[in-house]
Amino acid sequence: MVFLSIPNGKTLSIDVNPNSTTISAFEQLAHQRSDVPQSFLRYSLRMRNPSRVFVDSKDSDSILLSDLGVSRFSTVIIHVLLLGGMQAAPPKPRLDFLNSKPPSNYVAGLGRGATGFTTRSDIGPARAAPDLPDRSALATAAAPGVGRGAGKPSEAEAEDDEEAEEKRYDENQTFDEFEGNDVGLFANAEYDEDDKEADAIWESIDQRMDSRRKDRREAKLKEEIEKYRASNPKITEQFADLKRKLHTLSADEWDSIPEIGDYSLRNKKKKFESFVPIPDTLLEKAKKEKELVMALDPKSRAAGGSETPWGQTPVTDLTAVGEGRGTVLSLKLDNLSDSVSGQTVVDPKGYLTDLKSMKRTTDEEIYDRNRARLLYKSLTQSNPKNPNGWIAAARVEEVDGKIKAARFQIQRGCEECPKNEDVWLEACRLANPEDAKGVIAKGVKLIPNSVKLWLEAAKLEHDVENKSRVLRKGLEHIPDSVRLWKAVVELANEEDARILLHRAVECCPLHLELWVALARLETYAESKKVLNKAREKLPKEPAIWITAAKLEEANGKLDEANDNTAMVGKIIDRGIKTLQREGVVIDRENWMSEAEACERVGSVATCQAIIKNTIGIGVEEEDRKRTWVADADECKKRGSIETARAIYAHALSVFLTKKSIWLKAAQLEKSHGSRESLDALLRKAVTYVPQAEVLWLMGAKEKWLAGDVPAARAILQEAYAAIPNSEEIWLAAFKLEFENKEPERARMLLAKARERGGTERVWMKSAIVERELGNVEEERRLLNEGLKQFPTFFKLWLMLGQLEERFKHLEQARKAYDTGLKHCPHCIPLWLSLADLEEKVNGLNKARAILTTARKKNPGGAELWLAAIRAELRHDNKREAEHLMSKALQDCPKSGILWAADIEMAPRPRRKTKSIDAMKKCDRDPHVTIAVAKLFWQDKKVEKARAWFERAVTVGPDIGDFWALFYKFELQHGSDEDRKEVVAKCVACEPKHGEKWQAISKAVENAHQPIEVILKRVVNALSKEENSA
């Protein structure tokens, strides 16, 4: 490089080598850089004693710069030769200054005190003012760039400028926002590289300023748009919910909708209507347009069509052309679909779907990818040893669909970071399947200790033997890699796996899984040896002791003559003590988790041994019962039945006389055990807790359900011997005999119970037996005697009144109800029965008065309000019923039966609103839930209705009417499996309440009917009631 010092004081540089550059070449370069004519150039070196250098032009092509003493970084001073003469200079024209450039910082009129002002040219007119430059200057000078960033004009723009010059007006003149209509001081300046670089910098600054807070501005704008749309919804959105309901309208309802007419026509004045006949020319033209020409013009045939007049050529029908293209595409797809050669790669059925699913790249995504590409390019250039930069750059190219560029980037990453395994893994992923093996081979050569690379190399192999060979090669370099050992063992057969595991435990003696896997593959004797070695290497590992216990249990199962259950318990006990000596903290929760894991793999004895030895660790003595019961419940919820059974067994060994634990254990056996295990548990329970009635009764019931009536009778006799004065046992014995059609034995048992001073329930059961046997007088006698002893037991008064009603003795029935209300004034069933009787005999007014009296004596009685409302509805007093309903809801705002009745009474459009109000007041009430389910049923929303029916029977399983409605729903919309499931659940819940259910189940003809039969009869009753309504 040589520096040039030119006359205007600037210093330029020329990239030349003085040892190889001649004088003539240097003069040409100096001329190009300084614009000084080559013939006027004179130069000298900058030294302490500078000397002028003169070189003959003949020798300039052979003399080098170094011959003149010029070296690298020397400074050559350029001089311009001035030539003088004897002749005077020619005079300049008088007005020549008008065509020359003004000096810098020139302000017109400044010398005479003029000041600046603003004109229209500064602001900018509506049209650009004409530019009248000098023609001679335009002819000789090149057209300058206009404005910032303008380049060299094209040929089309030059032609436009020539036309504007002829018009003396430039129509394409631009307006500069800073300099007004004048395009700037540098309008005629040359647009060089510095200007281009400055424009690029300013453009990048503008883009940067525009990108700042762009996401925040866009999010704010989006939020404002959403707020505006939320506050000003469209009409279609306001009526969207109503439009959805239009599909429920039938065809007749659609036809009944009146047509809206244009009533504005009434106010319009009728104008005079004039009719003009169509001209014949128009009709003739239309006829010709529809006409189909089948013959050619003779002239056109003679000339071969070359003389066809252009104007008479018909216009192409573009619609028909488009339809034809669609037909051709359809035929092609049909041919492809019918192809049986198997060589086509087109799926004609999914062709259009694939076109729709093609990813469209937006401008924003392209911009983001370009930015990311530049960022990662800068990262890889500044820090090429960072593998993450190369991986990220390759993935950017991959996302952009440029897989070749991605492979190139990751290849460079492998070259720059050959010791990084992630780069090689990424290169393997991006490579072709046939090249991936070569890539991973290079990686393992450079990084032979990388486990990931060896595993990836094995994954690329398709043959099991090749996979195993690769993994074994990796183990030669990394013998202590557990992952490689596991992978190679998984691929080997049982014999090879045993050999490999022997070597694996030698290389990795502190890894438990390898020891356990080896113990499972060995024989019983060898497994014990392996586990002993593992215990020596890992003395603080509890899993070894658990595996030893499982091994002992499994060996005992194989050898039926040798029961190793006791040995399993000893192993676990010894293991816990050994671990405690080693300083291992026995975590009760972890050991219980291990017990559940043992249960899942079938090692029940090991599970029981773990629970027995660890369940009491860390539990206070006073908290043992509560903690153990809670643990058993949690295990039962998780499905760990054997673990829960082991917890109950250990708890019962500590708390032998706790009835609640025996009962929970019995319930567990009833749900998940066998009849034999339940019977054995109950026998053991009544041995330790003989005074527990519920345990005796449960044992007798299980025997009865199993069909063993004599065994059930024997259990009740033992219970009677243990608890002679227990009413529950007397009644259970009565029920057993009565349900098995032994009325005489049942009557005898009840007689003995009455003699021993039986309670009111004994007298009621006695009357029920006589009612079913048809002994009316005996039934009446028992009821009267029972009422003398227990006058406040309302059920006896109800039975007496119902007895008189059955035989149409209405006065005696009224007298029985009245007398019962004197003794039981707050018994709502008695008030309801009396009101129903009065409505039948004396009409609505009497019943209304009785119900009003009942409500005064029993405030807050929702059943009384409901009875009054239904009485009004039966007599078509809908307005009075609605009035009573409003008062009832004010008096009982939390009553579910009132809200359910209110939903059913409401008109169809208002039922949804009523149901929402009801759910707000009493969400968990089963009556409201069943009312909502019926709404969905009416709207034919089957799945929602089924979900709400299931919710109702879950909340109120004791109400038989809900099960009947659910079964009726499944009869219409469910399958046979659904109906069987509903019946099974109903039988399991044994419902006893419900208006229809109680009326039908307590009828004399249904006394001994099973629950399934009663369920179907309730459904029939509901269907009849619906049809009659």
Swiss-Prot record:
Keyword Repeat set for record:
yes
Give the span(s) annotated as Disordered.
142-170
Reply yes or no: does the keyword Nucleus apply. yes
Which positions does the entry assign to TPR repeats?
Answer: 625-658, 794-827, 926-959
Q: How does it assemble?
A: Component of a pre-mRNA splicing complex. Interacts with ZOP1. Interacts with PRP31.
Annotated tissue distribution: Ubiquitous.
The record's section on SMART domains has: HAT, TPR
Q: What Pfam families does the record tag this protein with?
A: HAT_PRP39_N, PRP1_N, TPR_19
Question: What does the UniProt entry report for the null mutant?
Answer: Lethal when homozygous.
SUPFAM superfamilies membership: TPR-like (SSF48452)
The UniProt entry, under PANTHER family, shows: PRE-MRNA SPLICING FACTOR, PRE-MRNA-PROCESSING FACTOR 6
Q: Where is this cross-link: Glycyl lysine isopeptide (Gly-Lys) (interchain with K-? in acceptor proteins)?
A: 85
Q: Which key words tag this protein in UniProt? A: Coiled coil, Isopeptide bond, mRNA processing, mRNA splicing, Nucleus, Repeat, Spliceosome, TPR repeat
Annotated HAT repeats reside at: 367-399, 401-431, 432-462, 463-494, 496-524, 526-554, 639-671, 673-705, 707-739, 741-772, 774-806, 808-840, 842-874, 876-908, 940-972
Localization of this protein: Nucleus; Nucleus, Cajal body
* Residue ranges annotated for the Ubiquitin-like domain, each copy included: 1-85
Q: What is the effect of changing residue 413 to D?
A: Suppresses the transcriptional silencing of RdDM targets
Species for this entry: Arabidopsis thaliana
One Gene Ontology cellular component: spliceosomal complex
Alphabetized InterPro entries for the sequence: HAT, PRP1_N, Syf1-like, TPR-like_helical_dom_sf, TPR_rpt, Ubiquitin-like_dom
* Coiled coil (residue ranges): 210-243
Tell me the function of this protein. Pre-mRNA splicing factor required for splicing and for the turnover of unstable transcripts. May be a U5 snRNP-associated protein involved in the formation of U4/U6-U5 tri-snRNP. Involved in responses to abiotic stresses. Involved in microRNAs (miRNAs) biogenesis by functioning in primary miRNAs (pri-miRNAs) splicing. Required for DNA methylation and transcriptional silencing through the RNA-directed DNA methylation (RdDM) pathway.
Q: What induces it?
A: Up-regulated by cold stress, but not by abscisic acid or salt treatment.
Q: What protein is this chain from?
A: Protein STABILIZED1
Q: Spell out the note in the miscellaneous section.
A: The sta1-1 mutation causes the stabilization of the normally unstable STA1 transcript and increases the expression levels of miRNA target genes.
Q: Name one GO biological process term.
A: mRNA splicing, via spliceosome
